[in-house]
Each structure stands twice: as structure tokens, then as C-alpha cells.
């Protein structure tokens, strides 16, 4: 049984993330597992990263339910220590195959002995979380940060 891990901050969960989760599901197969690991899980609300871990988890679960995709969601707190990140994260998401489109993350996991499935995303430039967050803020006509969330 293959266990595939998709790691990200998901601020917010967007189409690029959806493509990664679908690729993980395909790689895991019918008998496998998909784990979505939410980074920066300790982070509280802030204007640049407006969703809490529970809100990000709700986005992911709602999407997965609509897509009929079974997955596990776990949170991972930041430790700001790249050399020890993989060991720290593995305690939360378990062992498996990392499915990612992020080269630095892929390199970090491979250096720790992980198998990594790289996924090419054709719209990476437009499907970056910071662009999505900026667009949402620009489209909002509400100036109260709590209301805009």
C-alpha cells in the first residue's frame, strides 16, 4: 500500500493544490492513502496569511468531499530549522512518498532518503498562494479584515 504525502501551507487551498492531491491519489492507487499535511499550523490569522489551520482544513475537506476523494489531514507546526524539518514533519504525516511541485521541498526530502514524485504544474506562475491571496484582497469591497476573511 502506497501512502502519498502532499505538503503545503494551503493559504488558501487552490487549483494547483487540487492537482497535487489528485496526482497523489492516482499515484497511491485504490488501496493507497493520501495525507495532506498543512504547514504553519500554529500560525494565527494575519493579513498576509488570513486562514487558520482549521479554516484551511475545512477548505481541503470540503473540496475532497465534493471530489469524492478520501484523505487524511494533519497539521505541522513550523520549527524554522530546514535541516531537521523532514524528521519533524514525518512525526506528523508519517512515512510515504512525497508528491510535490516544489523543487526545494523535493530536494530536502530526497536528501533525507524519501522517494519523491515530482508533479509539473503548467500554471505555477498563476496558481501561487500569494497571488490568490492578493487577488482576493483586491476583489474585496470590505475593508474590515475580519469581514474579508
Segments (PLM) and residue ranges:
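Nucleotidyltransferase catalytic core that binds NTPs
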Residues: 1-149
Amino acid at each position: 500500500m502506497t501512502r502519498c504525502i502532499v505538503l503545503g501551507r494551503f493559504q488558501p487551498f487552490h487549483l494547483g493544490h487540487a492537482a497535487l492531491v489528485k496526482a497523489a491519489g492516482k499515484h497511491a492507487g485504490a488501496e493507497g492513502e493520501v495525507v495532506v499535511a498543512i504547514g504553519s499550523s500554529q500560525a494565527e490569522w494575519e493579513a498576509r496569511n488570513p486562514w487558520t489551520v482549521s479554516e484551511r482544513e475545512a477548505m481541503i475537506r470540503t473540496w475532497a468531499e465534493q471530489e469524492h476523494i478520501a484523505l487524511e489531514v494533519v497539521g505541522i507546526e513550523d520549527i524554522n530549522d530546514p535541516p531537521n524539518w523532514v524528521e519533524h514533519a514525518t512525526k506528523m504525516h508519517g512515512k510515504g512518498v512525497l508528491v510535490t511541485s516544489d523543487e526545494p521541498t523535493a530536494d530536502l526530502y530526497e536528501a533525507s532518503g524519501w522517494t519523491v514524485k515530482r508533479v509539473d504544474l503548467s500554471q505555477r506562475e498563476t496558481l501561487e498562494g500569494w497571488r490568490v491571496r492578493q487577488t482576493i484582497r483586491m476583489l474585496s469591497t470590505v475593508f474590515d479584515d475580519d469581514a474579508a476573511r
